[in-house]
A protein has these predicted regions:
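PLP-dependent class I/II
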Residues: 1-174
Length: 174
């Protein structure tokens, strides 16, 4: 699961996540929820954490991180959140056997700096700036290329342009 979805930026609705949790419980599936774009939501929208969904705690592994929020995707870092004790023990055992999961000192300092009031203020200001740019882009297309459809923009910072109205076939578009 990727919430908000990458690459389209859709924030999954709670009712859809509840249904996913029901199915995962019925079929014994572990859900790995990539929520790395969760800090990047616009228009007052928020991304529901999968662990907060009814019935999800027993089978959920949630990954968050700072790469998208702070623009340092080259820094290898993720927060893994597992509420269920047995699932966490299985994950930790595997992590230990595979020798991964430690932080280098630089990443450690980045994480400590980011999870502060100043870090949140920076993310909020960055999101406002990105949203303004998305609006500029949408306005430009509405004025100059009105048949192009701008898609995305709930979460993440990616917009897609549907150019189909300007071409009579896929071959022409290519």
């Amino acid at each position: 699961l990727c919430n908000p979805h990458n690459p389209i930026g859709q924030i999954w609705k709670e009712k859809d996540l509840v249904r996913l949790a029901e199915l995962a419980n019925r079929y014994g599936v572990i859900v790995y929820s990539d929520e790395i774009f969760a800090d990047n939501c616009y228009q007052g929208l928020t991304c529901p954490c999968y662990l907060d969904i009814k019935g999800a705690k027993s089978h959920a592994i949630v990954a968050t991180g700072l790469g998208k929020s702070f623009g340092f995707t080259g820094v290898n870092h993720a927060n893994i959140i597992i509420a269920d004790d047995e699932l966490r023990a299985r994950f930790t055992d595997r992590r230990t056997r595979d020798h991964y999961g430690s932080l280098d000192p630089c990443v450690y300092e980045c994480v400590l700096s980011a999870y502060t009031k100043d870090g949140k203020a920076w993310v909020d200001a960055s999101n406002a700036y990105v949203w303004e740019n998305m609006c500029v882009l949408r306005d430009y297309f509405a004025k100059h290329l009105p048949k192009a459809r701008v898609c995305g923009g709930e979460g993440a910072y990616i917009l897609w342009i549907d150019w189909a109205a300007y071409f009579s076939s896929g071959d022409e578009l290519n």
